[in-house]
Amino acid sequence: MADQTLSFPPSEAGKLGPYLTPTRAHRAPALPFVTLTFATSLDSALSLAPGTRTALSGPQSKAMTHYLRSRHDAICVGVGTAIADDPGLNCRLQGVDTAQQPRPIVVDPRLRWEFTRESKVLQLVRAGRGLAPFIITADRTPPSSQRALLEEHGGKYVFLAHDSLTKQRFKWDNMLRAIAAEGLQSIMIEGGGDIINSLLEPESCHLIDSVILTIAPTWLGQGGVVVSPPRRLGSLGEPIPAARLTDTTWIPLGEDVVLCGRLASQT
């Protein structure tokens, strides 16, 4: 648990500033500001295989991720990431105290995440270096021991109805409204693949305010977890691109490149 404190140069932080403020005057106050951010390989992969933790970010882009966490009220991952990575879901940026830590959000429709007192996120709470997670689930009967452990650390379950009984998923606008109702006005969506791809689907991608991607100079090869949302169809039923970024900025960070942008309007 001796995680190194990180620093991020103000000169680089300034380049990210335009993508960290609200950009749409018609944004409903019931929805938080949403930043989609993740690290990807040159072949759009997040990891070598499902359930396999894969480090992609170099030291400078890793520090950038923690700077971004310091600028958001919450960070969101799916249950697969929580199980595979045992993530800390905190901000290690120098000078960030407990009150400035982002709230972890774990999307776990069927309560698959069997966290324990030794889970890293809860260890960090006890060390005063992070906050306990809010777990979004459709299962209204969590084990009493899990619930007690979570609430002991300051976390809780947030209950939400499924979008579909077959997909076992939530509608993104419902999730974001539930998050905003907890007083969280901005959120980073960090992964994993199912979470990212579902957010980029046509019915939900309009909810994204900014996109900040780290591109690592490596190919992971076939069989990895990839970011590849469904294609859209044009007026004649022809396939058209799923989404495109506009207002882009490219920022070299060590051997990585960071791409910032906003989703172009879909017509």
PLM regions with names:
Residues 1-267:
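Enzymes that bind and transform nitrogen-containing heteroaromatic metabolites
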